[in-house]
Amino acid sequence: MPIAGKFITFEGGEGAGKSTQLTRLAERLRAAGEGVLSLREPGGTPFGEKMRDVLKQPGSAIQPAAEALLFASCRAQLVADVIAPALAAGQVVLCDRFIDSTVAYQAGGRGLDRALIESANRLACGAVRPDLTILLDLDPARGLGRASVRDHGQPDRFEVLGAEFHRKVRALYHALAQEEPGRFFVLDAARPPEAVEEEIWHEVARRFR
């Protein structure tokens, strides 16, 4: 499977199963002999992990514009320090959230100007773009229910936002997938994790065989 040096991102709303499916794909790729680097956003660098605590902490009074710029700052550090070198070395890079999360959450959910968000993403990422984006699509109510169980009833500052916010996020994810059908692979995340895992594996094999 000629997948060395490819960049795959996982996107979706709360509780869609992104981290679960990323871990399962990483395990299968490693079993196939591939070098894999698994990352998450925000995070992946000392700076990013500190900002993750700030951005996800319930009750953090962060203005939407400041929030968007913090995400872009974390991304710029991650791309320069980790992602770009790993891709250049031939590793497969898997990332739990990337540029599309900021567009969906900050432009879709928060209502910020999408063009400005995308401009910040271009500055943060340079020429680095995902080769494949796996969008795990799930009804927000169901996803938030899953997240509540996962977090033992202690939601982060995005999970506590209202249903309308999360519907807007989902709608913009759908728009992004329609605009770039060659990059996005959209799955029904309401199905059992094993079924989702198999569909992802077949798609990765198809694209990069």
Task: Give names to the regions the model predicted.
Residues 10:
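Hydrophobic anchor at the beta1->P-loop junction of P-loop NTPases
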Residues 32-125, 199:
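ATP-dependent small-molecule kinase phosphotransfer cores
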Residues 15:
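Walker A (P-loop) phosphate-binding loop of P-loop NTPases
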Residues 102-171:
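A glycine- and Lys/Arg-enriched "phosphate-lid" helix/loop adjacent to the NTP-binding pocket
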Residues 1-7:
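Extreme N-terminal, non-catalytic leader segments
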Residues 21:
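Hydrophobic positions on the alpha1 helix immediately C-terminal to the Walker A/P-loop
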Residues 2, 24-26, 141-209:
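NTP-dependent small-molecule kinase module
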Residues 18:
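Conserved lysine of the Walker
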